[in-house]
UniProtKB/Swiss-Prot annotation:
It comes from the Eukaryota. The gene is DBP3. Residues 39-58, 92-102 have a biased composition (Basic residues). Residues 1-139 are annotated as: Disordered. The Q motif is unique to and characteristic of the DEAD box family of RNA helicases and controls ATP binding and hydrolysis. ATP binds at A225, E226, T227, G228, S229, G230, K231, T232. Residues 212-396 form the Helicase ATP-binding domain. The lineage of its organism: Eukaryota, Fungi, Dikarya, Ascomycota, Pezizomycotina. One of its GO terms (cellular component) is preribosome, large subunit precursor. Residues 433-566 form the Helicase C-terminal domain. Gene3D superfamilies: P-loop containing nucleotide triphosphate hydrolases. A motif (DEAD box) lies at residues 342-345. This is ATP-dependent RNA helicase DBP3.
Length: 566
């Protein structure tokens, strides 16, 4: 081979090798495992960083939502004290506002009230804007109390004049400005009011006018008014309206327990029976049942009555009998959404305090029930205990003994005072001539056209009442009696005979002094001075009722000094 050819061949080989080397280098760059591994690491690192950033962002978002929920629910747990970025704070506030709006909308929806743009609308032509109610959904009832247009249209000066004339003082810790219901037409339209249950009455009594707006709004109410002022209807109307607008809870078939949705507790059998009669007439108009439970009557008969009605919507009871049925398990108050203590000062007196705690403790918690207390007096000694059963109660006080709002206190406190329409007289007599003087007073009071006037004679002890009754019978006085030693049927007959006018004189111990509706009592005579000033006020409060005048005479002897404060 010539040198030229060899040189050319070497050049071709070198060129081929360079091309091959270049191709090999390209191939190594694309397929070399080490290079691929390096690229993957870089990519993984980048992906990991992005995931971490997303996770941190999500965590911050969740923290912000949790903080917003804590603010919304009032949670007392500690939250991050470090300042948040402005954007995050704004985001939290927006979420809170949205949640508030949703909650309000849900509440309106659950109440059954039609809404327009989230604002409750009343379909009645006579309805005005919704008024404050404080706790409308607390016990599960669909409260939608609204002042009527006719009530709204009354000038404020006339409202103030009405309150002053009727001596009404209202103290509301929540400051809801609800006007008194001056006329029955001012009551919201409902199934009950459409039946015209008040057709025979001219206007609500002051305690009804003052308490109804708040009670119909779902608020707890303390009503303080003299006896004979219409307190029974003051709590009966909102109780029945509340139950009529709420669904009945379901219970297992075959459950023999009697469940109630409302309970009214009264201190005496007579008052319980009287309240039962008044509430039954209203409840029947809307298909609700009322059962009365009291001592002195067979338990089996009352159990049978409960079974017959599959329980009762409303139970009116004395504390002792209700406590017995609760302990036996035949009555349950776990569904009670409306509780009433009638004659509350006596109910919370020393002997009833534990019973009341047991009864109210068997009901729904106070946050989930409505509690009303009505009474003629409100002694300082029981105010604190009574308010422990309630939430932000409104105090409606009737009479010139009120001091609600005085000097900016707004505490609704009252001074104990007898009915100012009652003429009071005290006669100091010799103990041995007391019953003879009683006979003289009765004959003087029942002269001529007043011979059938009703006179109520109070004794301190049962034995004294029996002796006085027998003595008057021997002297030809038409008399009957009511005291603790009599059977329930005997007490009922005596009370009905006195109300009907068959007998014109009723001899009683203090058991008859509280809350009984005995119309047209012209005179009250205290043969023996009562043990407390509260009992004295309630005794003489049997006369001078419903705006009428009355008279009370107390026979006072040296033996009465020890318990009269003399």
């Amino acid at each position: 081979m010539s040198a030229g050819k060899k040189h050319a061949r070497d050049g071709e080989d070198q060129g081929a090798r360079l091309v091959k080397k270049a191709k090999t280098a390209d191939t190594q760059t694309d397929s070399d495992p080490a290079a691929l591994k390096t690229d993957k690491k870089k990519k993984d690192k980048k992906d990991k960083k992005e995931r971490k950033e997303k996770k941190e962002k999500k965590s911050k978002k969740e923290d912000a939502e949790e903080d917003s929920e804590e603010l919304q629910n009032g949670d007392s747990a500690a939250v991050d004290s470090e300042p948040k970025p402005e954007k995050e704070k704004k985001e939290k506030n927006n979420k809170k506002d949205k949640k508030d709006k949703k909650d309000k909308k849900d509440k309106l929806k659950s109440s059954g009230a039609p809404t327009t743009n989230g604002i409750a609308q009343d379909g009645e032509a006579n309805a005005a804007t919704t008024t404050p109610n404080g706790s409308a959904q607390r016990n599960g009832a669909a409260y939608s109390y609204q002042q009527t247009k006719t009530l709204d249209a009354i000038p404020e000066d006339e409202i103030k004049e009405f309150l002053a004339k009727q001596e009404i003082a209202i103290a509301d810790p929540l400051g809801a400005n609800l006007r008194p219901i001056i006329h029955f037409s001012h009551l919201p339209t409902s199934t009950l009011t459409s039946k015209k249950p008040f057709a025979s009455f001219t206007a609500p009594t002051p305690i009804q006018a003052a308490s109804w707006p708040f009670a119909l709004s779902g608020r707890d109410v303390i009503g303080i008014a003299e006896t004979g002022s219409g307190k029974t209807m003051a709590f009966a109307v909102p109780c029945i309206e509340s139950l009529a607008s709420s669904p009945k809870p379901n219970h297992a078939k075959g459950d023999r327990t009697a469940y109630a949705r409302a309970v009214v507790v009264s201190p005496t059998r007579e008052l319980a029976m009287q309240t039962h009669a008044a509430m039954s007439s209203l409840a029947s108009l809307v298909g609700l049942s009322v059962v009365c439970l009291y001592g002195g009557a067979p338990k089996d008969d009352q159990r049978a009555l409960l079974r017959k009605n599959s329980g009762a919507d409303i139970i009116v009871a004395t504390p002792g009998r209700l406590k017995d049925f609760l302990s036996e398990g035949c009555v349950s108050l776990s569904d009670v959404m409306f509780a009433v203590l009638d004659e509350a000062d006596r109910m919370l007196d020393k002997g009833f305090e534990e019973d009341i705690k047991l009864i109210l403790g068997s009901c729904r918690p106070r946050e989930k029930r409505q509690t009303l207390m009505f009474t003629a007096t409100w002694p300082t000694s029981v105010r604190g205990l009574a308010e422990g059963f309630m939430i932000d109660p409104v105090k409606a006080t009737i009479g010139n003994r009120t001091r609600a709002g005085e000097e900016g206190e707004g505490n609704g406190s009252t001074e104990l005072q007898a009915n100012i329409r009652i003429e009071q007289k005290v006669e100091v007599v010799d103990p041995r001539g007391k019953e003879q003087r009683l006979l003289e007073l009765l004959k003087e009071a029942q002269k001529g056209s007043a011979k059938n006037d009703r006179i109520l004679v109070f004794c301190l002890y049962k034995k004294e009442a029996v002796r006085v009754e027998q003595n008057l019978e021997r002297r030809g006085i038409r008399v009957c009696s009511i005291h603790g030693d009599l059977r329930q049927d005997q007490r009922t007959r005596s009370l009905e005979s006195f109300k009907a006018g068959t007998t014109s004189v009723l001899v009683a111990t203090d058991v008859a002094a509280r809350g009984l509706d005995i119309p047209e009592v012209k005179l009250v005579i205290n043969v023996t001075f009562p043990l407390t000033i509260e009992d004295y006020v309630h005794r003489i409060g049997r006369t001078g009722r419903a705006g009428k005048k009355g008279k009370a005479i107390t026979l006072f002897t040296e033996h009465d000094k020890s318990h009269s404060g003399s």
